[in-house]
């Protein structure tokens, strides 16, 4: 009798994201008799012929796969429906596509529903927002099961004290000056466009006085960033400001900063959504065009920072959530009442 297999599929260039990695680690420990397969090939390139071949390969793999776990639109529509024993699970990590769909339907609600995820048998939306989005704007087969009221694996993990302690030790190893301080994380994602003349990309924060901002932020805060534009600005700071500022690249991952942050400033829907379970302050900082920014500006305007200078409007002596931040946290994460990894383990233990 052949072994049961579980396939992790990611075809949008994201590889095994943190949610998939956490689920994989748990399943490998809990189900040692199961074989695991991976299809992580990006299917969108600049060469149409390659795209066609990659799509054919993805369709063949997913058709033959016994069980699939994905976290984005990686399961093709043009494959047969799953059999009664097969599981196709979508972990709905809050990537930008969710906000793109929401804004399109908000502006034009009469559009036909999308079939993007129609071959999934199980969906873990991770938040009330995503659950409503998927029910409102997507088509599903009759037998689909929504695993509601359960946070995503990374959100659950962010609250686990053992992991928080491990990451804290790592932070204090690299930045001993952060010990005992509150952590302000400025985590920005996106690729700056390359200038046509071949010169270096411009610093998008060039016009801002970082010293003024650092002086404004109370001394009981330590500012952490992954952003090189901010690091370049930090060269203008006197040495004593190193007690308040650190650059985490090649030291600590962006995801790990979710475990430690007391306030998050980001342009990433994924990080904002994952962090919302902590019920701590979140702000969106405009840095490269993001549909998530349009969403925040329209529906949570007090959380929107149009530029770096607007940090000077924040009250760093108060970490109580504003009414809009409370609403955001309620909308973008379920309460941590059930371990998502254990739920997924039960789903595949048949």
Placement of each model-derived feature along the sequence:
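N-terminal pre-catalytic "stem/leader" segment of glycosyltransferase-like enzymes
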Residues: 1-66, 75-76, 193
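A donor-sugar binding/catalytic signature common to diverse glycosyltransferases
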Residues: 73-94, 135, 251-293
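Extended catalytic core of nucleotide-activated donor transferases of GT-like folds
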Residues: 21, 46-113
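A nucleotide-sugar donor-handling region in carbohydrate enzymes
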Residues: 98-99, 105, 112-195, 324-327
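Catalytic binding pocket for nucleotide-activated donors in carbohydrate/polymer assembly enzymes
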Residues: 238-241, 270-336
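C-terminal alpha-helical cap of glycosyltransferases
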Residues: 335-350
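Conserved catalytic-core segment of nucleotide-activated headgroup transferases in glycan assembly
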Residues: 17-26, 147-236
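Donor nucleotide-activated moiety binding/catalytic core segment of transferases
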Residues: 51-65, 224-273
